[in-house]
Amino acid sequence: MDDEETAEVEVEANPLDPIDDAIQDDLSPLDPPSSDMSLESPGSEDDSDLEALPRWMIPQNRLRSAVDMMVSQARTQNGGIAALLNRDNFLQRVRSMVFSQERRRSRTSDDTSQDGGEQAEEPPQPIPRTPIDIDMEEGVRFDTNLPAEHSYFGNHLSRVPGVDYLEHILFPGEVLPFMIDGSLFDDEMPGLDGLIFGVGFPLMQPPEDNPHKLYGVTCQVYEKGESGRQLVFYKSRALQRIVINCDDIQGPPQYIARNPTSKCFSKVKILPEYFLPEPLKCVDMGSMSRFRDIPSMRDKYRRYQLSSTPWPADACQEYAYEEIVERARKKLEIHKIDTMPRCPIQLSFWLVRNLHLTEKMMRLTFLTDSVNTRLQLIGSTLKEESLFYCRYCNSSLAYCSDLFAMSKHGVQTQYCNPEGYIHETNTVYRVMSHAIGYSGEPSTKFSWFPGYQWHIILCKFCAQHVGWEFKAVEPNLAPKVFFGLAGSSVRIGKASESTPVNGSSFVVRNMLRLISNEME
């Protein structure tokens, strides 16, 4: 898809600067504080005596409260924080907000003293979110097999032979589409074997005991097609986790990243996948084993098993994963996902992709070689309510409970835009009100979802690209509208985080620092 982010970082590719740069650029043309920005300047008739205080005597908590209020108000307006800083007399408006809040506190204090016997009002409860049921929408249900085929590459893809025996998923189980110069692979792709290559994760911090390790996955190409621009479309599937010793790499990886027409080679170590079956399933109860699969006798049978083993019940429960799988199944029923694998190894990686863990938890599940431990880590997150936050300003964008599968591969899928940039996309029914704005015009060109047009969406608070809105252009197609959040622009966080929904402590801190410098 054609948006601000491309594989080659160019100036015109991302016209929206990060929030720190936007703040500095917007404030740079401001002149030094003039008399109308001074706290000693005459105020209106309603101004309190606080306005006559020197600027350095304004309490920091009052200043922060005023800035937080202005930031919250800016989020619901067009232009977000950038528009707030572009207005004239910014510091004067900050000072006026301080005085306005002080007068409001004074009036509230007087009202409270007069009505001291009355009980304080309870804070308003959040408005419950109305659940969305896509089955209630009229029209033809979208075929989730279409996005998995990546048909936006065209219809002239040829199957690469020799990879059918690797159709099973090892890690992460995702199809990785990409578009590069065909000369990189064609010379080394035998006629009967699909090319296997490695994809490294340089941003994944290795363990402290060996900082020279690079983790990644092996991938195998299984389809390719011509683009007509001396580029070749490839589809590959991730297979296994690997670790590379950076000292063994033949060719500097940093140079390869900047020059994609070059290659590097290295020996890799395939990381093992250890799985221990549940201990009680290994206990032979003789003739009583026939009661194992009878629901009414299952609990009693389990108690007999525990009494006949030297292991405590907690030790047996540590390796039990069926309960975790059942809890995950119930949670994913909301997302209309019914393609859960049966193999525990495949299942552990599949759950990581579809349950949307935090970045820290993703790293832990990737680095562990024990499937049982991986499933236990996943099970510890099932009760948590998670949100999508803007990676640039920490503003809340959407609830993870609104995720749903528009592809047979799940709620999170890799897609490639016309410039070759690969986007990790999370599909959700809706985003929070006043959370997004739009950029450019909608288009159906190179659409990842046939029958839908895409429209670039921005975080309304910091004006950074966070994904796309997809709207049906074919009649009777359901869902009518949904959103795709770009994995590079959002992060997963707990709903219990202290980050305010209508503001950002990160932006507030930066504004306070700039205001402090201007007012000294």
Swiss-Prot record:
Residues 1-52, 100-133 are annotated as: Disordered. GO terms for molecular function: metal ion binding. Residues 25-42 have a biased composition (Low complexity). Residues 385-494 form the CULT domain. GO terms for biological process: positive regulation of neuromuscular synaptic transmission; positive regulation of Wnt signaling pathway; protein ubiquitination. Residues 1-11 have a biased composition (Acidic residues). Its main location: nucleus. The keyword Zinc applies. Ubiquitinated. One of its GO terms (cellular component) is nucleus. It is found in: Nucleus. Keywords: Metal-binding, Nucleus, Ubl conjugation, Ubl conjugation pathway, Zinc. PROSITE patterns: CULT, LON_N. Residues 101-110 have a biased composition (Basic and acidic residues). Likely a component of a DCX (DDB1-CUL4-X-box) protein ligase complex. May interact with pic/DDB1. Belongs to the CRBN family. Substrate recognition component of a DCX (DDB1-CUL4-X-box) E3 protein ligase complex that mediates the ubiquitination and subsequent proteasomal degradation of target proteins. Has an essential role in mediating growth by negatively regulating insulin signaling. It also has a role in maintaining presynaptic function in the neuromuscular junction synapses of third-instar larvae. This is Protein cereblon. It comes from Drosophila ananassae. The gene is ohgt.
